Amino acid sequence: SNSKADIKEGKATYTNDKGEVTTAKVKLKNGDLEEVEIDETAQGKDKSKKALGNDYQMKQASKIGKEWYEQIDFLEKYIEKKGVDSIKLNKEGKAENNDVTSGCTIRIDGFLKAVKEAEKNAK
């Protein structure tokens, strides 16, 4: 068919109780979530957590031995495949799904809020 895909992009932010700001960007294709990008400012640092990479030094403290950007990469791919609403959260704002916690054990409630908001804002 020669119909052009309907591509929409949206962006949103969420600020947590530590004052760290999450930015979520999404790309929708024909109404379906195709791309998700999540990043967050790091307290007292002039680079984002993604930009800090291994220098953010979460790996040592991580139950699954993964740095922040690695856990977020996993989460982004999961959301692209299964959507935000497929993720169940516990009271701490962390995922309960085993197929999420295998790659992402950090608190993600704010990230999910930002992604949902970005989807709403997609134009």
Q: Where on the chain are the PLM-derived regions?
A:
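Active-site- and interface-proximal helix/loop "cap" or "latch" segments in soluble metabolic
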Residues: 7-9, 14-123
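Sec-dependent signal peptide cleavage junction
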Residues: 1-3
